């Protein structure tokens, strides 16, 4: 080997990668320590337009990058060494794929002559993420003659990560030793104008004739719904509100849709349907003729059952990502069109035929929302004991305008859906609902905190925190401000609501999984301010104090058996109130 020529090619190679990332809008690179990734780690660390975020654990690092990409609305990159380090990125890649979050996965590897022959820290990394990435390429070892190909590959990769449906891409990067590039030569390359290849994603649209035909048909339907599921495109709320007013249809807004909270919210925006759609009389009486669906499948199971109860309704899925987020198999029309463009164009097409005043259908849904919300608030807010529903019923007034609430999976996201109703103050509610896992939640939330300048609160269950306790290290390493609202019911609370709860002889062992962990030492380990809040005033005071900065862990303890009672007491109260208000019988 000609070492001088090798280092020259290596330096140009990794410099071109760093320049291409920056030229294509990547600003953040999450780096895990390792030897084989040395050349690229040094390049991204020295590039003036890239910021490096060190992370010691690859699984947490992947989710941290995912959170940053969510916050920025642009791809983040994550770099790791070869071997099992790569495999640890799989959970985050799966989530990014299903949640349509743009990630650029950069994995160092051994060169071909060291693969599949027992070389240390070497595994088969070719296609390791399978169908969970938008694109995979196993790049050649550094070669001066292939620099144009490298730049084209980087531009293509970032472009694919950003294009609808956004998602992860994987670049596998073999490097031979020696691994240290020429520092002075790299600095000179970075001072030159980069010759990067760039890709501009396009928006999907439909023809004017098709849109006019749709508008004409929608005018004929008085009993319509707009459903905004998780992960709607940013800033869709005001456009959906305008469309709802044109059609006189209520919006059933999932808390993770970005539509339930903000100054655009008015009486058309409903957030308590998870409660009143448990009422069989309402479900049977109010059959929709048409349903316009945006985003992923909603969190609410009662809403899913409602749609299944009315299979003959015309369901139209609007998906700018041209994917398939329709597990019910009820929708017979799928429009692969940019959601923003669609809402504006359809609202314009409906302007001349807008209905006068609210319809009886709209009034019934708005009344059901107001009735259920009143019952829930009047039942939960006077309660003295700390409950999981009561916590989310209070968070709407406790969180400051513009805050980010990251909700964990299992019970927290469901309680957020049911009990944290619409509000006009901006609130950004985020969760990992791609694969619905409880892994990587702390790291995702801290990635959000790193990528934005808003107060961040993560509401997590105890098992979720234990799953990703390593992720807390990022808060200390990068001096991040974040509040963990820990809902500790000593195990898997959601199983108490499922049929498994009847298996009493094995329930605690297999499903309840009590652990008895004391979280105070965990907080101390990571220099977090710890509070065990035993009443509502203590929770409120600790939450407000946490917004002064730093990492805070506020623990509230609940009982799983009482939690079931707290939930199941509410549903008959809502049903009775609907009946007394005369809402359960269609007019």
Swiss-Prot record:
This is 2-succinyl-5-enolpyruvyl-6-hydroxy-3-cyclohexene-1-carboxylate synthase. Its EC number is 2.2.1.9. GO terms for molecular function: 2-succinyl-5-enolpyruvyl-6-hydroxy-3-cyclohexene-1-carboxylic-acid synthase activity; magnesium ion binding; manganese ion binding; thiamine pyrophosphate binding. Keywords: Magnesium, Manganese, Menaquinone biosynthesis, Metal-binding, Thiamine pyrophosphate, Transferase. Coiled coil: none annotated. Homodimer. The keyword Transmembrane does not apply. It comes from Chloroflexus aurantiacus (strain ATCC 29366 / DSM 635 / J-10-fl). It is an enzyme of class 2 (transferase). The gene is menD. The lineage of its organism: Bacteria, Bacillati, Chloroflexota, Chloroflexia, Chloroflexales. InterPro entries: DHS-like_NAD/FAD-binding_dom, MenaQ_synth_MenD, MenD_middle, THDP-binding, Thiamin_PyroP_enz_TPP-bd_dom, TPP_enzyme_TPP-bd.
């Amino acid at each position: 080997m000609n070492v001088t020529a090798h280092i020259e090619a290596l330096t140009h190679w990794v410099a071109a990668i760093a320049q291409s990332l920056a030229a294509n809008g990547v600003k953040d690179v999450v780096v895990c320590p390792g030897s084989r990734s040395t050349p690229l780690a040094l390049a991204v660390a020295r590039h003036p337009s890239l910021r490096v975020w060190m992370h010691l654990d690859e699984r947490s690092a992947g989710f941290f990058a995912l959170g940053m990409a969510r916050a920025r609305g642009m791809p983040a990159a994550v770099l790791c060494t070869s071997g099992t380090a790569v495999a640890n990125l799989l959970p985050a890649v799966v989530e990014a794929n299903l949640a349509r979050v743009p990630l650029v996965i950069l994995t160092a590897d051994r060169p071909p002559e060291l693969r599949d022959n027992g070389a240390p820290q070497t595994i088969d990394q070719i296609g390791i993420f399978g169908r969970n990435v938008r694109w995979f390429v196993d790049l050649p070892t550094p070669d001066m003659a292939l620099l144009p190909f490298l730049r084209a590959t980087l531009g293509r990769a970032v472009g694919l990560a950003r294009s609808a449906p956004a998602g992860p891409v994987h670049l596998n990067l073999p490097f031979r030793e020696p691994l240290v590039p020429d520092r002075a030569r790299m600095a000179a390359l970075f001072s030159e104008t980069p010759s990067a290849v760039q890709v501009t994603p396009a928006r999907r649209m439909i023809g004017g004739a098709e849109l006019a035909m749709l508008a004409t048909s929608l005018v004929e339907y008085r009993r319509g719904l707009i459903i905004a599921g998780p992960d709607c495109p940013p800033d869709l709320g005001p456009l959906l509100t305008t469309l709802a007013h044109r059609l006189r249809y209520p919006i059933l807004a999932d808390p993770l849709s970005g539509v339930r909270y903000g100054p655009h919210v008015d009486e058309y925006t409903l957030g308590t349907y998870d409660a009143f759609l448990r009422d069989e009389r309402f479900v049977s009486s109010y059959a929709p003729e048409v349903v316009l669906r945006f985003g992923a499948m909603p969190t609410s199971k009662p809403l899913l059952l409602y749609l299944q109860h009315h299979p003959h309704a015309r369901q139209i899925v609007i998906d700018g990502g041209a994917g398939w987020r329709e597990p019910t198999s009820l929708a017979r029309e799928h429009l692969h069109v940019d959601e923003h463009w669609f809402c504006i164009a359809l609202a314009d097409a409906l302007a001349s035929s807008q209905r006068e005043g609210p319809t009886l259908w709209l009034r019934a849904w708005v009344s059901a929302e107001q009735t259920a919300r009143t019952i829930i608030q009047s039942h939960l807010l006077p309660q003295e004991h700390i409950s999981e529903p009561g916590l989310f019923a209070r968070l709407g007034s406790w969180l400051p305008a513009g805050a980010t609430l990251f909700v964990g999976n299992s019970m927290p996201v469901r309680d957020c859906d049911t009990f944290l109703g619409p509000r006009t103050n901006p609130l950004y509610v985020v969760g990992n609902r791609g694969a619905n896992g409880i892994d990587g939640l702390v790291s995702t939330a801290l990635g959000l905190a790193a990528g934005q300048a808003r107060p961040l609160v993560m509401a997590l269950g105890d098992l979720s925190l234990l799953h990703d306790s390593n992720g807390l290290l990022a808060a200390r390493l990068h001096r991040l401000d974040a509040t963990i609202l820990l809902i500790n019911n000593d195990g898997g609370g959601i199983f108490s609501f499922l049929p498994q709860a009847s298996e009493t002889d094995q329930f605690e062992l297999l499903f309840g999984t009590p652990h008895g962990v004391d979280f105070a030492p965990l907080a101390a380990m990571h220099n977090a301010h710890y509070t065990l809040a035993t009443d509502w005033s203590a929770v409120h005071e600790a939450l407000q104090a946490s917004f002064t900065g730093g990492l805070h862990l506020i623990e509230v303890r609940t009982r799983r058996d009482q939690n079931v009672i707290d939930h199941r007491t509410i549903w008959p109260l809502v049903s009775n109130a609907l009946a007394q208000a005369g809402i359960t019988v269609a007019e």
